[in-house]
């Protein structure tokens, strides 16, 4: 089981590796830059060398960078498009520099017509990401709750992937809280299997690479993005157990993004999930 959490790399990647180990994680996700804006931290070559050794010792895999919330792949305004294009391009290279496997992004919001927004997402990914010569991290588009003009249903992601020509370098990251808020009832094994069947039919399971494992503070089908601690939300322990024991969902790399006061609380959630895995 590959299970970890969203951790900071502000004090250096080797320290993040040590933190992951201390909470019982064998994978982690991090923001590629300040999630609310600002310049990216430059990672020195010596730090990258130390990181590679620390990662090897800790058996951390996979590593996922997450683009900041200020990125909007569906932006209509030219200034916002330029910013998003720059961040997607530059942060792809930054994740590649530390040998990260995945780069996760919210698909974004549309302005005006929904299809026009989806088409802008396709164009921006082509220009800023697919233009980069491999190897590099696989871009994973995240399933979203569907707040307002937010893009991120399974049908949306299918449209984007089809528009891109189904490239091997673009895939999907699920989010249990977002899916629940979007109307997918994951509280039972049958509900989880219904989701898996939909993914198999429209996306292809080989393209689904990771999941953000979060409980939901928002009700089923509410289209509100509100995370809760593991077992403390609408999914509850029973729902989290259904997800982690699903033959497909439970074998994905799982990243916690739950509201915690400190990283030690992530450790408590990881221990709980490991117990639920055997239920």
Swiss-Prot record:
Q: What is its EC number?
A: 3.1.21.2
Fetch the PROSITE patterns from UniProt. Answer: AP_NUCLEASE_F2_3, AP_NUCLEASE_F2_4
Instruction: Report the SMART domains cross-referenced here.
Output: AP2Ec
Q: Which UniProt keywords apply?
A: DNA damage, DNA repair, Endonuclease, Hydrolase, Metal-binding, Nuclease, Zinc
The question of whether Manganese is a record keyword is answered with no
**Which residues participate in Zn(2+) 1 binding?**
66, 106, 142
Binding positions for Zn(2+) 3?
A: 178, 225, 227
A GO term, aspect molecular function: DNA binding
| Source domain of life | Bacteria
In this chain, Zn(2+) 2 is annotated as bound at 142, 175, 212, 257
Quote the cofactor binding remark.
Answer: Binds 3 Zn(2+) ions.
Disulfide linkages recorded for this protein, renumbered to the chain, are: none
- UniProt enzyme class: hydrolase
**What biological-process terms (Gene Ontology) are attached?**
base-excision repair
Substrates-to-products reaction catalysed: Endonucleolytic cleavage to 5'-phosphooligonucleotide end-products
* Co-factor(s): Zn(2+)
Give the protein's biological function. Answer: Endonuclease IV plays a role in DNA repair. It cleaves phosphodiester bonds at apurinic or apyrimidinic (AP) sites, generating a 3'-hydroxyl group and a 5'-terminal sugar phosphate.
Family statement: Belongs to the AP endonuclease 2 family.
Name the UniProt record assigns to this protein: Probable endonuclease 4
The scientific name of the source species is Moorella thermoacetica (strain ATCC 39073 / JCM 9320)
**Lineage summary:** Bacteria, Bacillati, Bacillota, Clostridia, Moorellales
């Amino acid at each position: 089981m590959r299970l970890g959490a969203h951790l900071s790399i502000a004090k250096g990647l080797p320290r993040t590796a040590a933190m992951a180990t201390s909470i019982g994680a064998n994978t982690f996700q991090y923001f590629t830059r300040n999630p609310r804006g600002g310049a990216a931290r430059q990672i020195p070559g010596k730090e990258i060398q130390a990181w590679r050794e620390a990662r090897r010792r800790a058996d951390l895999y996979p590593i996922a960078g997450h683009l900041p919330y200020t990125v909007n792949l569906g932006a209509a305004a030219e200034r916002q498009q330029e910013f998003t294009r720059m961040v997607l391009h530059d942060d792809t290279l930054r994740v590649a520099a530390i040998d990260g496997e995945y780069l996760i992004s919210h698909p974004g919001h549309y302005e005006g017509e929904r299809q026009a927004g989806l088409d802008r997402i396709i164009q921006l990914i082509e220009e800023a990401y697919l233009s980069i010569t491999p190897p590099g991290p696989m871009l994973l588009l995240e399933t979203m709750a569907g707040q307002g003009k937010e893009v991120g249903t399974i049908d949306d992601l299918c449209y984007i992937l089809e528009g891109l020509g189904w490239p091997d370098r673009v895939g999907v990251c699920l989010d249990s809280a977002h899916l629940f808020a979007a109307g997918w009832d994951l509280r039972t094994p049958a509900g989880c299997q219904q989701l898996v069947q939909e993914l198999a039919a429209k996306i292809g399971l080989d393209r689904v690479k990771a999941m953000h494992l979060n409980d939901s503070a928002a009700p089923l089908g509410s289209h509100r993005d509100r995370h809760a601690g593991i077992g403390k939300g609408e999914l509850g322990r029973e729902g989290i157990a259904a997800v982690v024991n699903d033959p497909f969902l439970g074998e994905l790399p799982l990243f916690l993004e739950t509201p915690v006061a400190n990283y030690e609380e992530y450790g408590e959630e990881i221990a709980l999930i490991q117990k639920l895995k055997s239920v």
